[in-house]
């Protein structure tokens, strides 16, 4: 039984990028879909599409590579884990990697990128980082 499907999804994206695959499939949850949408908005993934087979949903993710066939994702890492939750206040999530990276934060207003959460003046649980 899988206890952390967000970590599983990040691992699937990381492994697909290392193997230079064009597409990978993730299990669906609203948090994962919001996280993938942030990755697409920030330019780390090309696109995504939710597929439904009966009552089972999956997310098909298209990875993005630069002109040299190198993944645009340098590192993708789970921050808050089931055994150790990490929360940051509105002042702590301002920047990550001097603006070159993105933190995904679960807030009371939904799953947001760190810059959007800072603009709204809210903090929350840091789900993952990507740069």
Swiss-Prot record:
InterPro entries assigned to the protein according to its UniProt record, in alphabetical order: Ribosomal_uS8, Ribosomal_uS8_CS, Ribosomal_uS8_sf
UniProt KW keywords: Ribonucleoprotein, Ribosomal protein, RNA-binding, rRNA-binding
SUPFAM superfamilies: Ribosomal protein S8
One cellular component (GO) term of this entry: ribosome
Any one biological process term the GO annotation gives: translation
Tagged with keyword Lyase: no
A Pfam family reported for this protein in Swiss-Prot or TrEMBL: Ribosomal_S8
Molecular function terms, GO-annotated: rRNA binding; structural constituent of ribosome
UniProt keyword Ribosomal protein, yes or no: yes
Subunit structure: Part of the 30S ribosomal subunit. Contacts proteins S5 and S12.
Family note: Belongs to the universal ribosomal protein uS8 family.
Function: One of the primary rRNA binding proteins, it binds directly to 16S rRNA central domain where it helps coordinate assembly of the platform of the 30S subunit.
Name listed for the protein in its UniProt record: Small ribosomal subunit protein uS8
Name of the coding gene: rpsH
């Amino acid at each position: 039984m899988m206890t952390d499907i967000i970590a599983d999804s990040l691992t699937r994206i990381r492994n697909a990028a290392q193997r230079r695959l064009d597409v990978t499939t993730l299990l669906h949850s609203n948090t994962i879909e919001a996280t993938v949408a942030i990755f697409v908005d920030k330019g780390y993934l090309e696109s995504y599409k939710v597929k439904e087979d009966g009552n089972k949903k999956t997310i098909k993710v298209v990875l993005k590579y630069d002109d040299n066939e190198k993944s645009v994702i340098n590192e993708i890492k789970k921050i808050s884990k089931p055994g150790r939750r990490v929360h940051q206040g509105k002042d702590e999530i301002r920047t990550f990697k001097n603006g070159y990276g993105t933190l995904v934060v679960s807030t009371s207003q939904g799953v947001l990128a760190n810059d959007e959460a800072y603009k709204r003046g809210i903090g929350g649980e840091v789900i993952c980082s990507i740069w």
